[in-house]
């Protein structure tokens, strides 16, 4: 059974869906710029959750919004001498490019705030009618003190928040708000800014109300899972709960899941610290999409993820092992060794077959148990690595010993291991990438250097022999001395 940490209860709970179809809402991006590593961390984690639910035979409807009207978008439009729509559409296209590269499944629906203005206005009218909202001079605010449960997600103290907010209000806000903690549902239009018609005059929606309206319109009044980063717990998700539950008299979501933040070399990632990295910058610098995905999955989604060059390099090396294993058939076919998946198992010894099937079933159970345990991707990755190692080792051995004798039992073991590896990596969204050999060196060049090294050794020029060995290792070639006269090699 799947167990998830619920931010609302502060406990790990058994997941029990409302209906046959699991309804999930994920807070999307404000589309004014390229996505950064924090977005990668969040959307990779939730993509694995979605994939695992599907793997566990659940039907899933996954909705993720776009905030396409916001102060940041308007500011960017002004800087670029463009329009709000042009900025948002451009960055939506860039968002898809990044997410597709990382192997993130596209949501079933991706509503935009600007397409839900009528729904948003209707939602606010309900809150106003019930006494949870009040209009002042073209603005509409939510009255926090009317909601006795406000703060239940974040454990915020309303009175303390009220005091803290008093010094942050503009003079206009202090004249309009009943209390400093009250937040905007509708904002009066400013001169020369895009606006929409509403019962309170021209304006645009507040950030929080957008999600409440879109959740209801896309998924209904109560959903199974609501997702987002830990930075959204307060005020965004707290305010979503307040709005939705006040309007609908129903629980907004049964499970609230939040991912941890990204640090860079132990410091919070931010533009002010100049350690801010976009997904595009990282991929353009040579990091493969699956290396980044693998790196994100090595740490539990709720914990902070510390991004360092060393950690990324380590992830790259580990991913190479898995990627080579996933490329098993491509490599063995190139070397004219046939170990096809559909090859007959007729001549495999029954006891051997039972042994291998049992071992693989145990690995699948461990993999599933890891993800059942609050999406423990690090534990799942460990099982993936266990499956990849024997495949990688066989390739190394095969490249070293060209006429390697392999029996039907061993072929069966390799085929079943690869089939399982492909199945489980798909759950984590890890997919085979082209193997790029840096400083590529041909077989003829390798043999020539091996012969030169043997001559150097015979002449007791061990410094030259070591120099050749180290030079080949830098090019990804490891030498294995079988005897004083025979040296074989393998690509690392």
Curated annotation (Swiss-Prot):
Catalytic activity as recorded in UniProt: tRNA(Cys) + L-cysteine + ATP = L-cysteinyl-tRNA(Cys) + AMP + diphosphate
Principal subcellular localization: cytoplasm
Localization, UniProt: Cytoplasm
Positions that bind Zn(2+): 27, 211, 236, 240
A GO term, aspect molecular function: cysteine-tRNA ligase activity
Annotated positions binding ATP: 271
Sequence motif: 'KMSKS' region, positions: 268-272
Entry-linked Gene3D superfamilies: Cysteine-tRNA ligase, C-terminal anti-codon recognition domain (1.20.120.1910), HUPs (3.40.50.620)
Top-rank lineage group of the source organism: Bacteria
SMART domains: DALR_2
Nuclease is among the record's keywords: no
GO biological process terms, semicolon-separated: cysteinyl-tRNA aminoacylation
Protein EC: 6.1.1.16
One Gene Ontology cellular component annotation held by this UniProt entry: cytosol
Note on how the cofactor is bound: Binds 1 zinc ion per subunit.
Motif 'HIGH' region: where in chain: 29-39
Pfam families listed in its UniProt record: DALR_2 (PF09190), tRNA-synt_1e (PF01406)
Alphabetic keyword roster: Aminoacyl-tRNA synthetase, ATP-binding, Cytoplasm, Ligase, Metal-binding, Nucleotide-binding, Protein biosynthesis, Zinc
Cofactor(s), by name: Zn(2+)
Subunit structure: Monomer.
PANTHER family: CYSTEINE--TRNA LIGASE, CYTOPLASMIC (PTHR10890:SF3), CYSTEINYL-TRNA SYNTHETASE (PTHR10890)
Similarity-based family: Belongs to the class-I aminoacyl-tRNA synthetase family.
Protein's UniProt name: Cysteine--tRNA ligase
Organism: Prochlorococcus marinus (strain MIT 9515)
Gene, per the UniProt record: cysS
